[in-house]
Amino acid sequence: MKKTLAALIVGAFAASAANAAVVYNNEGTNVELGGRLSVIAEQSNSTRKDQKQQHGELRNAGSRFHIKATHNFGDGFYAQGYLETRLVSDYQSSSDNFGNIITKYAYVTLGNKGFGEVKLGRAKTISDGITSAEDKEYGVLENKEYIPKDGNSVGYTFKGIDGLVLGANYLLAQKREAYKTATATPGEVIAQVISNGVQVGAKYDANNIIAGIAYGRTNYREDLATQDKSGKKQQVNGALSTLGYRFSDLGLLVSLDSGYAKTKNYKDKHEKRYFVSPGFQYELMEDTNVYGNFKYERNSVDQGKKAREHAVLFGVDHKLHKQVLTYIEGAYARTRTNDKGKTEKTEKEKSVGVGLRVYF
């Protein structure tokens, strides 16, 4: 029997839970282990920062594992601890990108099925799941430039109404100085890193309709030691939104994502950026899906430099087994930058890859 697109999307969001193994379940306590190994063979000119030439590589593409412990108190109350890692290299010279085990998320949760939950620690924020565009590796949406999608935070999430998620987050300082230098004091927030921030958002996903919006205000520590414009970011006010509709009988989802942000700089001109991105996801046949999206993004400085980016992504994925996924994905982006008195600069990014994910 052919699966509906709604079922596929719900399954994708619950992939980690569906593939996790229950290693302990007794007297209201449940412990799960899960994760995936992911490898991609690619041709790309944007694997590393400032890369110019296109190269072929076989590398890690988000391999991870997680452990989740849930303790049920009764009457719908529960506590949960969650730890998720990544297997990545700290060195740009490591071509396969496998390396140390690092912590991606680590948090504790106290909640009630009817009243919502409070989450404390390094976790995703409400803005993480707002946009609808699908990708496996080369996502062209840079949502974190508008609103941070994770970090050290205190968050509240309410899911008491079917299909509706409401959330709010307060972000704390992400990095602090460890040593005393001529320009740094131990314990102070590192320059140009998040000092604090707030986010609120809502997403509705039911009755074939998807709608979501999030707003965030993020403050950054000024870099007093840097005299040029690179150290002047003060505050970013950003918003993200999505609107989509599922044609269940056709196995088709169409969506429109968008974002807007204004960056305030210390004693310097402000910056504005926005994007719009129509996209689709289509169930070609059982266990095979086609997806893609287009993005137009503009970034400008008051009476100054302007950059326009056009980007497109297209992919096909196929489930070989309930715990094995393979995909082909490609992305192309072109950015044109104009600055007063200077020749227009054009940059292009091209990537195509074949990936394999094995869940456990």
Swiss-Prot record:
The keyword Secreted does not apply. One of its GO terms (cellular component) is pore complex. It is found in: Cell outer membrane. It comes from the Bacteria. It holds the Pfam family Porin_4. Keywords: Cell outer membrane, Ion transport, Membrane, Porin, Signal, Transmembrane, Transmembrane beta strand, Transport. The keyword Membrane applies. GO terms for molecular function: porin activity. It is a multi-pass membrane protein. Residues 1-20 form the signal peptide. One of its GO terms (biological process) is monoatomic ion transport. Homotrimer. Forms pores that allow passive diffusion of small molecules across the outer membrane. Belongs to the Gram-negative porin family. This is Outer membrane protein P2. It comes from Haemophilus influenzae.
